[in-house]
Amino acid sequence: MRYLTSGESHGPQLTVIIEGVPANLEINVADINEEMFKRQGGYGRGRRMQIEKDAIEIVSGVRNGYTLGSPITLIVTNDDFTHWKKIMGADPISEEDQDNMKRVITKPRPGHADLIGGMKYNHRDLRNVLERSSARETAARVAVGAVSKILLKQLDINFYSRVVEIGGVKDDLEYDLDTIKSNIDKNDVRVVNDEIAQTMRDKIDAAKKAGDTIGGVVQTIIEGVPVGIGSYVHYDRKLDGRIAQGVVSINAFKGVSFGEGFKAAEKPGSEIQDEILYDTTNGYYRGSNHLGGFEGGMSNGMPIVVNGVMKPIPTLYKPLNSVDINTKESFKASIERSDSCAVPAASVVVENVVAFELAKALLEEFQCNHIEQLQSQIKERRLLNIEY
């Protein structure tokens, strides 16, 4: 299973082609659009999300509600393109066109791809870099993840994501999984505790007022993953490694951990390793889940717990110093419309990116042409955990 995305932030559309989805999988557009809607939400989002009404259109690979086994093509229209047709259109324009020249960017923003991307691809207008490097592309990746989640749900694999920290305000209380499930969508910061949610909102408001931005930590929990997905044999087949790469490939993500993550460095091994237990109903299981569902690069049957660290968004309304690439003079960096905090929305992005990585690994592990084959093989693997 693989995918390709194309499109610019203010271009006419984002396009996704997904290859390798088994045939006979029931696809409901409303389920995909629900994920798209969640990505647009969250406290701290900017004005762009008031313009876009993200909804996907399926143009290939699905007929009468079921996948065909051929490549699936999805389109997400950029409503804001209406205001950018001349600037972002494919047709040549005159250098004397003043409307376009006003949008030329020569002052790169610290923390963005602007300067290095301009150097690498020899662009003198840095808009050619920022349009593709924009986090707008994550809308396409969420669409891919939504299809992946539909597939995984047919295998009784379910996802939950939440915010655990924004701008130093932490929701680090211990919750059972049922409490997390029932509370994550009850407020606009996607945090379990409502009192902590308000403190986070206040933190976001203060950053916005100061022309600044803040980051945070998000968590994705996956329930129902069968044992042995991934491999200890080869470095590039370790499932936790593949998930880690997927997470840090998301715009502004600078770190990833599993289970207790970096806290493991503070504790002795006796408090971090998860004891192995057995009963005739569940088979092998662990007495705890400090390692977040992984051993040796493979799923061990416990819930997979992925933590991702998002840096503050680098576009600031009180910009930092930069240098004009034409004059080499010092200036304040360019300002683009942006969010003051996108951590709640990013939790949705991480969830869907992880869903793709897991679906891809499963389809490599269990070769199949249609969903019924896959379901049969997953059932056998689950029995292995009891019978071994």
From Swiss-Prot:
InterPro entries documented for this protein: Chorismate_synth (IPR000453), Chorismate_synth_AroC_sf (IPR035904), Chorismate_synthase_CS (IPR020541)
Entry EC no(s): 4.2.3.5
Annotated Gene Ontology cellular component terms: cytosol
Cofactor: FMNH2
Residues the record lists as binding NADP(+): 39, 45
UniProt keyword terms in alphabetical order: Amino-acid biosynthesis, Aromatic amino acid biosynthesis, FAD, Flavoprotein, FMN, Lyase, NADP
UniProt entry tagged with the keyword Amino-acid biosynthesis: yes
Pathway(s) of this molecule: Metabolic intermediate biosynthesis; chorismate biosynthesis; chorismate from D-erythrose 4-phosphate and phosphoenolpyruvate: step 7/7
Residues binding FMN: 132-134, 251-252, 296, 311-315, 337
CDD domains documented for this protein: Chorismate_synthase
Function: This reaction introduces a second double bond into the aromatic ring system.
Assembly and oligomerization: Homotetramer.
Family in the record: Belongs to the chorismate synthase family.
UniProt cross-references to PANTHER family, sorted A to Z: CHORISMATE SYNTHASE
NCBIfam families in alphabetical order: aroC, PRK05382.1
Record-given protein name: Chorismate synthase
Source organism of this protein record: Staphylococcus saprophyticus subsp. saprophyticus (strain ATCC 15305 / DSM 20229 / NCIMB 8711 / NCTC 7292 / S-41)
Taxonomic placement: Bacteria, Bacillati, Bacillota, Bacilli, Bacillales
